[in-house]
């Protein structure tokens, strides 16, 4: 990436994309400010909780782990420096109002 030490750059949104862009821009020397309208960062990687339940507000699966590996490697780090992954089985469970439920199993494709 070019030398951006003379540049001030605003990034709109503190989701995965915005935070990744800000990290790369800052690594190139830019003075970066990230703006986020919500009180939490993470974009769709949030959750809502209430009445004993937890809901993802976005992705429920860790897709394309190689992209996360490459991002952290670009900064001399590994994902495990920041978080642990645990395979869940079932992947998730869906509950209906009448008490029925369905489990979505953990299985690899291919």
What are these regions (language model features)?
Residues 4-34:
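N-terminal Rossmann-like FAD-binding beta1-loop-alpha1 element of flavoenzymes
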Residues 12-15, 37, 58, 64:
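A secondary-structure boundary/capping signal
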Residues 26-51:
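Glycine-rich FAD pyrophosphate-binding loop
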Residues 53-67, 78-110:
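Dinucleotide-binding Rossmann-like beta1-alpha1 core, especially the glycine-rich loop
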Residues 72:
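Beta-rich carbohydrate-recognition and catalytic domains
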């Amino acid at each position: 990436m070019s030398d951006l030490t003379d540049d001030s750059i605003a990034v709109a949104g503190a989701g995965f994309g915005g935070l990744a862009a800000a990290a790369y821009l800052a690594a190139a020397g830019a003075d970066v400010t990230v703006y986020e309208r919500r009180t939490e960062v993470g974009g769709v990687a949030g959750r809502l909780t209430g009445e004993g339940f937890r809901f993802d507000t976005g992705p429920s699966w860790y897709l394309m782990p190689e992209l996360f590996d490459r991002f952290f490697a670009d900064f001399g780090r590994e994902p495990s420096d920041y978080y642990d992954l645990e395979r869940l089985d079932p992947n998730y469970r869906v509950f209906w109002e009448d008490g029925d439920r369905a489990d979505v199993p953990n299985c690899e494709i291919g």
